[in-house]
Regions:
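Phosphate-binding glycine-rich loop
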Residues: 55, 60-101
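Active-site phosphate-binding strand-loop segment of PLP-dependent enzymes
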Residues: 130-197, 208
Length: 873
């Protein structure tokens, strides 16, 4: 028997498969697929601070921690460099103590017999066989006692519980009966996988340790850190003290010692969650395997399953590796399983189980087999960020356009968007404005599947929730977190539907995947990346400072499985010579193994709407000084819950306009034009404008017959009254407006969602846009129609704006996106206030041209070859 005959030998398996080790789907090693829990990874990270000192000689801190947990003397515990070291220690001391023989209950972990053989002990192999469905604990007890009838007194018995490779389990009460029936034997019970069978009180003998027992326990199997090498044994104190002296000092290193203390001190729900998760996944794995004709699956309570293919070809193990890149545990080195038909598979993710079942079906039943499922999903690139406004949205649009330019049918996707900037599709669906722009970059029609969940905040803790383009209600944060659990399937279905129709997907995350307080409820960042099997680019905003600390800090919060999705870092919004950043890039790569794939510059003169409030170009402190000669001064009053502020972005690009954000009365200045934009909370924001003194300034401006434009919520504020009979936005059924226009608005449950291709205006040009608002507005005789939509229906039904002299109000978002209308309106206002009209377009807010320029800049500054290679394109 060879010592290396175990699962998890990645280099050997990769050589046989002819593949890179990281490309293998490994069922041969029984490790939680997500990797180590967060608390344990953090403990290992902290241990770095102690590697300059020797650890305690015999892991005394871990002994004390175990004693506190189990209520046993610390001297009862012996810690070692993995249970494998302790197995060999036991074999040696058993030989020294004159143990007549060692009985290894087969089939069993090969290391027991190997260690005893190396120590010179006689080894016997009573074969218990494999437990089947229907076999009772009583049957197993009788069989074991019968098999051990001729084992002499003072012999040692090695028994794994749960069994390896079978996963069969004998409850502690039955184990005690077994030990009591043969008190003349030393029972070595290996509980390496017992944590999967239940908490210690129902899975382990440690809570009532028998005198003739030695327990072997692993701290790395359940917690997915086999590379740390950490295990311990428990027995009576006198025995443990004597055996501990046989171990060399410092066999438990600083990392293993830190891991031991972290695991033993853990009071979180990690263990319960892991058991529940493993049970569900194990049942799924069993079902997948049973679905393959000719495979027999045996019962297990561990995180692995034993199965048999009696008609398996002799090279089944090798073919799984070579043809499918799948490694299982070949059990032919176990006693009683030498015919090549026995295999063990670790519990992994459901999609992994299906891949294994499909591969087995393809080998065992090639003629009847359905074609294997695709080995991977559509190629998917995902932009995540170290923060909000890191540039994810604009870069996602850039990659959509680059992929489209290179001939790929690409679609954007963002699972959940929190934004007050939304738009309407041709089907009347509401979705995030950023995803609409990304769809335009991909040259496809936007649809709500691209942004299945949209949150539009209306207070500090509440939002309107829009699912698949339709509002489902207003929710507070806690209420939404409960509701959100049911949205994950909606999000996955939306993504899968889109991905089935396109060649490549470009996903966008939200905020940062490093927000540890939000991870549990994540549906938009790493959880979405895992579902899409996306290659993730993490974007950091260098203009804010601290970008490399942010990249490394985010990486530190990611779990092992999440880190495997990271393809590279992108440093965004850089001003200067990127070559000066090379030392930082080398450091980040050395620390993480992940390369910086691009440094994108601060983008100028590319007029593409941003998603986040922090991103618009006129968010800096208001300038109240008189504008330069010939410049039209436009003040945008900013309600606290401003929405669709991108309506004004095209104005900011005009060289003859100074666009100012006004949030306080002292920011007012002497504007030529005041714009009151949309808001998600009209009544509350109107009250705030009154409290801040801004409402009075708006009224004074109107009294001087100054130009005034209200958009959506701004339209409603300008009217006589805002009625809310259903209490949609406030408890008050009626709120007085500013009284500047003869309008009365009434909120209604149904939302108006209209895409307006063309609308007539009082100017010699038309415009277009979209409407998003609750309820309707009625007008008196002094408020005349301003904009009228083209199309069917009575003219009164198609009104989307009103005018009273220099006071304009409209429900039309995006009206300034039209270059001709924007210039006509600006020149109309300029002439009226005594400024010379330009008479020609100064700026083209041509989104197509802007997207092409954006793609060119990103392509020049990002390693597209590396990204395409990662995507398999």
């Amino acid at each position: 028997m060879k010592p290396e005959a175990h699962g998890g030998d990645r280099l050997r398996m990769a050589a046989l498969a002819g593949r890179a080790p990281d490309s293998l789907l490994d069922f041969s090693v029984n490790v939680r697929p997500e990797g180590a829990p967060e608390f344990l990874r953090l403990a290992l990270c902290r241990a770095l601070d102690h590697i300059s000192a020797y650890p305690s000689p015999h892991a005394e801190e871990a002994m004390e921690a175990a004693a506190r947990v189990y209520g046993l003397p610390a001297d009862c515990f012996v810690f070692g460099n993995g249970t494998n070291e302790l197995i060999h220690l036991l074999a040696r001391v058993l030989k020294e103590d004159g143990t007549p023989c060692a009985a290894v209950i087969e089939p069993a972990f090969s290391e027991y017999a190997l260690a005893c053989g190396l120590a010179g002990l006689e080894v016997r192999h009573p074969d218990c066989g494999v437990r089947r469905d229907g076999d009772s604990d009583e049957d197993m007890l009788r069989q074991l006692l019968s098999l051990l009838a001729d084992i002499p007194a003072r012999a040692a018995v090695w028994l794994a519980n749960p069994g390896n490779p079978s996963g069969s389990f004998l409850p502690p009460a039955s184990c005690r009966r077994l030990l009591e029936a043969r008190p003349d034997l030393l029972w070595i019970i290996d509980e390496a996988f017992a944590a999967y069978a239940g908490p210690d009180d129902i899975s382990s003998l440690i809570t009532q340790l028998p005198d003739n027992a030695v327990l072997l326990r692993s701290l790395t199997k359940f917690h997915a850190v086999p590379g740390v090498r950490l295990g311990y044994m428990v027995t009576r104190a006198e025995r443990a003290r004597r055996w501990r002296r046989q171990l060399p000092a410092w066999s438990v290193n600083a990392f293993a010692l830190a891991a031991a203390q972290a695991v033993l001190a853990d009071t979180s729900d990690f263990a319960d969650r892991t058991r529940d998760e493993n049970r569900r996944r194990r049942e799924h794995l069993c079902a997948c395997l049973r679905d393959v004709p000719g495979i027999t699956v045996f019962p297990s309570l561990a995180n692995y399953v034993l199965f048999r293919c009696e008609q398996a070809p002799a090279d089944l193990y090798a073919r799984l590796l070579r043809e499918y890149g799948i490694a299982v545990r070949d059990c032919s080195n176990y006693r009683g399983m030498k015919d090549g038909s026995w295999f063990r598979a670790a519990v992994r993710l459901e999609e992994d189980h299906q891949r294994l079942a499909d591969a087995l079906r393809g080998i065992l039943h090639p003629a009847a087999s359905v074609p294997p499922r695709p080995r991977s999903r559509r190629p998917a690139l995902m932009l995540q960020g170290t923060s909000s406004d890191a540039g994810k949205s604009i870069l996602a649009a850039a990659f959509c356009r680059i992929l489209r330019q290179d001939g790929y049918d690409v679609a954007p996707f963002k699972a959940q968007n929190m934004s007050l900037n939304s738009g309407v599709t041709a089907l009347g669906e509401e979705m995030g404005r950023a995803q609409i722009v990304q769809a335009q970059a991909a040259r496809i029609d936007p649809e709500a599947l691209m942004n299945p969940v949209l949150l539009k905040p209306h207070s500090e803790t509440g939002s309107q929730v829009i699912v698949l383009g339709k509002p489902v209600g207003h929710m507070q944060a806690r209420e939404y977190f409960r509701y959100k659990a049911g949205l994950w399937q909606t999000v996955r279905d939306a993504y899968d539907t889109l991905a089935d129709r396109h060649e490549v997907m470009v996903l966008e995350g939200a905020g940062s995947p490093g927000e540890v307080n939000l991870k549990q409820h994540d549906i938009v960042n790493m959880r979405m990346a895992a579902h899409a099997q996306a290659s993730v680019l993490l974007v950091g905003d260098i203009d804010r400072g601290g970008v490399y600390a942010s990249l490394l800090g985010t990486w530190m919060t990611l779990e092992q499985q999440e880190r495997s999705l990271l393809a590279g870092w992108l440093v965004n919004k850089f001003r200067g010579d990127a070559s000066f950043l090379e030392p930082a890039h080398a450091y980040v790569r050395q620390a993480t193994g992940i390369p910086v794939l691009g440094v994108t510059p601060w983008l100028r003169n590319i007029n593409i709407p941003d998603e986040d409030m922090a991103g618009f170009p006129w968010s800096q402190a208001a300038d109240t000084t008189p504008p330069p000669p010939g410049i039209l001064d436009i003040a945008v009053v900013m309600p606290r819950h401003v929405s669709n502020f991108t309506d004004m972005t095209p104005l900011a690009a005009e060289p003859d306009v100074r666009l100012r954000a006004v949030r306080r009365a002292e920011d007012w200045g002497q504007p030529h034009v005041v714009i009151l934009p949309g808001t998600k909370s009209v009544a509350a924001d109107l009250a705030a404008l009154r409290a801040d003194g801004l409402a009075e300034l708006i009224c004074r401006h109107a009294a001087r017959d100054g130009w005034l434009l209200g958009i959506c919520g701004g339209l409603q504020m300008l009217g006589r009254a805002i009625l809310d009979p259903l209490g949609l936005e406030s408890a008050a059924p009626s709120v007085p407006g500013l009284g500047l226009m003869d309008l009365e608005s009434t909120f209604a449950a149904d939302k108006t969602l209209v895409s307006v291709r063309r609308a007539a205006t009082p100017l010699p040009v038309m415009t277009g846009g979209y409407e998003i608002h609750h309820g309707h507005t009625s007008h008196g005789p002094s408020a005349l129609p301003l904009f009228v939509r083209e199309g069917q229906g009575a003219p009164e039904e198609r009104i989307c704006g009103y005018v009273s002299g220099r006071r304009w109000a409209t429900y039309l978002h995006g009206l300034f996106d039209d270059d001709a209308f924007r210039r006509a309106w600006l020149d109309h206002v300029r002439q009226d206030v005594g400024l010379k009209p330009q008479g020609r377009q100064l700026v083209r807010c041509d989104l197509e041209a802007s997207l092409d320029r954006l793609a060119d800049v990103v392509r020049q500054n990002v390693d597209m070859k590396a990204i395409y290679k990662r995507l398999g394109l």
